[in-house]
Regions:
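Active-site cofactor/cluster-binding pocket
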Residues: 1-130
């Protein structure tokens, strides 16, 4: 079973991203869960989202505490004391939204850097400025 933990801020789309990931897994014939964790947070507040993908039925009904993969939408969450390495398994993967192509984190075996903010601005212009 693959377990994912998404770190983001409200409004960045992590809850939607987890749902899309799980829908894609289901289309591929796998089982999946998307588990958002948020309350009255406003836009910009930290949000955690969890997901699981498995070949068979998933009996676990809890947050993800030992992720194989962490997806970080905003590296500035570290400034709030949020530790994206918490509970990661050996050999885990980090997918991180940053413009720092040399971004590294020794807690992860693989680090995949994606400048999603730049891609969004190139495709859509300034987001949220209607």
């Amino acid at each position: 079973m693959w377990e994912f933990k998404f770190y983001s801020r409200g409004g960045q789309g992590a809850v939607t991203a987890a749902k899309i990931l799980i829908n894609a897994a289901i289309i591929e014939g796998k089982y999946g869960q998307a588990i958002p964790s948020y309350g009255q947070e406003r836009k910009g507040a930290p949000v955690y989202t969890y997901a699981r993908i498995a070949e068979g039925p998933i009996d676990v009904k809890s947050y993800v505490y030992r992720p194989n993969c962490v997806i970080c939408f905003d590296t500035s969450l570290a400034d709030l004391g949020i530790d994206i390495t918490e509970g990661v398994r050996p050999g885990s993967t980090l997918i991180v939204n940053t413009d720092d192509a040399a971004y590294e984190n020794p807690a992860f075996e693989k680090v995949c850097v994606i400048d999603a903010d730049k891609i969004t601005h190139e495709l859509l212009g300034e987001v949220g400025t209607v």
